[in-house]
Each structure stands twice: as C-alpha cells, then as structure tokens.
Regions:
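P-loop NTPase catalytic phosphate-binding loop
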Residues: 2-25, 37-226, 230, 243-244, ...
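Intrinsically disordered or compositionally simple regulatory linkers and C-terminal tails
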Residues: 30-33, 43
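Short, surface-exposed amphipathic charged segments that create phosphate/polyanion-binding patches used
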Residues: 235-242
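Beta-sheet ligand-binding and adhesion/scaffold domains
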Residues: 249-260
Length: 268
C-alpha cells in the first residue's frame, strides 16, 4: 500500500507519538491505565495539510510517521479491501472516513460511492454529497438492484476512468443474501477493481468462521483492534503483531510487504 511523502505537520507527529506511547503502555501490563485518548485531528485539517491528491488516490488514514496512507484506484493489484476488527473497533467509522474524504478531495465525476449497511441511519451525514449513489439496507430490493446494476456497469466499463467505491458494512450480512445477488457480489470481488469498482468491506473479526470461504477473495486486509490472538492470527495468516493494542475507533494496521504499517483515522 503506497504512502504519499508529504511533509507531516507537528500536530500529526505528536498525535502519532501519543498512539505509540499508549501502545507501549498497553504492552506493559504493570503500567497503570493511561489517560483518556485525545481527540484525533479533524479530517478537513488533515486533508488541507496534505494538499490536492491525484485523481487516482484514495485517502485511508495517516501513518505513524505522519504521512498519508493512500490507495491507488488505477492499480487493481491490491484487489478488494477487507477491514476486520472487534465490535466497536471503528470499522464503520473507517468506511465513513473514506466517504467523507472522497467528498472533500475528488469531483463526483471521478469517484462515487454506494453503501450497503444494516444501519442506514448511521449514514445520514453523507447523503447530501453528489458523490453518494445511495444508502442500501441489507435485504432490501434496492440492494439487489444496486449490486446488479453495478455488476452490469463493471462488465461494460472498458475505457472510463471513473471509479465507484462499493462500501459494504458487514460481509456476513451480504453473504446471506439471495443467490443471484451473492454471485454478482462475488464477481465484483474478483473482477471489480480491474473495472474501476472497488469493494471495501467490513467484517466482525469474531464472526470470521461464518464466512471463512470468502476470505480468499481478499488479498489486502486492514485490521482494527482484535483482542483474541487466535482470531487475529487466523485472519492475518500469521502472527499479526499487537492488534490487541490498537486504539478502538482510531487506529488500524495493514501489512506492507513484510512489515506491518499502523495508521490512524482523523475525526469527521
């Protein structure tokens, strides 16, 4: 996952250092509980500091060194993105940060997004943006129609540079939909990024056993806090370091080559 090498302001470095200190305190069980976590810098401030992004760049967060973590939407190699974590770890907040950042950094002619969720009320704040295609409740007929139309668009999408983000909040729920919708969703996982459709999907880590056959579709996996080491290892494919030490709703980790990259979410 590439990072954009802009200069990082002192505030970003200080916040990153605070997260690092808290992680060290958590690792030392003899240390008393740390003070409450300070608020993360605002998304608008972070994006203003970064400056204009290339059309193909999707903002995901800020790394420990204060530099932005970006996904190149014109490079399909990473494939669909799976965001795993415990309940309350910030998976929905991650998707919402992506949606808000797109609205602030890109024209709707370049990037749009649609959301599939069990809780559409959580997405009211993004409905006013022209980048928003729709908020689709799991199990509703409109969700089936959206997945079908998106698959058709991807099939015929040969030359356009426009990208569509398919933000799915809870893989297990979508995996239980009707057979035709599930088949089209699987096709989007397999072929979507090469056709400018990017599925970004959340998973409750404790429920991974219910959808274990789906995991092979995700080469790129991002993790929020996972307290159970066995679950973390099963999802990461090896001994994922320190996922239990991540700050809920703020901090995430992904594998970058042979290393693990920690990053944090700005506040929306």
């Amino acid at each position: 996952m590439p990072t954009n090498r802009h200069n990082s302001p002192d505030a970003f470095r200080e916040f990153s250092q605070t997260l690092q200190t808290l992680a060290e305190l958590k690792a030392d069980t003899s240390t008393p509980p740390a003070k409450p976590m300070p608020a993360a810098p605002a998304l608008s401030d972070v994006l203003a500091e970064i400056g204009s992004l290339p059309t193909e760049a999707l903002f995901l967060g800020v790394a420990t060194d204060g530099l932005p973590v970006l996904l190149n939407l014109h490079d399909s190699h990473p494939g669909p993105i799976l965001i795993s974590g415990d309940a309350g770890s910030g998976k929905t907040a991650f998707l919402q940060t992506i949606a808000h950042s797109v609205a602030q950094t890109h024209d709707s002619e370049d990037i749009q997004f649609g959301v599939i969720t069990n809780y559409p009320d959580e997405w009211e704040s993004i409905k006013s943006t022209p980048h928003h295609i729709g908020i689709f409740p799991v199990g509703h007929k409109s969700t089936q129609e959206f997945v079908s139309s998106l698959a058709s668009w991807a099939h015929s999408n040969k030359n356009t540079q426009q990208c569509v983000l398919l933000l799915v909040d809870d893989l297990e729920s979508v995996a239980s939909l009707d057979l035709e919708t599930v088949q089209k969703f699987r096709w989007l996982l397999l072929r979507g990024p090469a056709r400018r459709v990017w599925p970004i999907v959340t998973l409750n880590a404790a429920r991974y056993g219910q959808i274990i056959s789906w995991l092979q579709n995700f080469r790129t996996r991002i993790f929020g806090q996972v307290a159970n080491g066995r679950v973390a290892e099963a999802l990461a494919g090896d001994k994922a370091p320190g996922l239990d030490q991540l700050e809920s709703r703020i901090q995430f980790s992904l594998r970058e080559n042979e290393n693990w990259l920690r990053f944090w979410l700005p506040s929306c």
